[in-house]
Amino acid sequence: MPAASRERALEAAVELLGAEGVRALSHARVDERAALPPGSTSNWFRTRRALLGGIVDWIAE
């Protein structure tokens, strides 16, 4: 998937964290919020920890 889709997933993850907190963060919820096909976020970030690390790295850029 293009980098734009990955960025859309990260934006959706940040929005989800802000709106509902870290306990609400899941790959499926990020996919849904970003309007991506199921499994997209898992493809880029295999674990929840990797997803959180990706968010931190993306924000730091």
Question: Would you name each region that the model predicts?
Answer:
Residues 4, 8-15, 19-20, 33, ...:
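Alpha-helical structural segments
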Residues 38-46:
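Base-recognition residues in the alpha-helical recognition helix of bacterial helix-turn-helix
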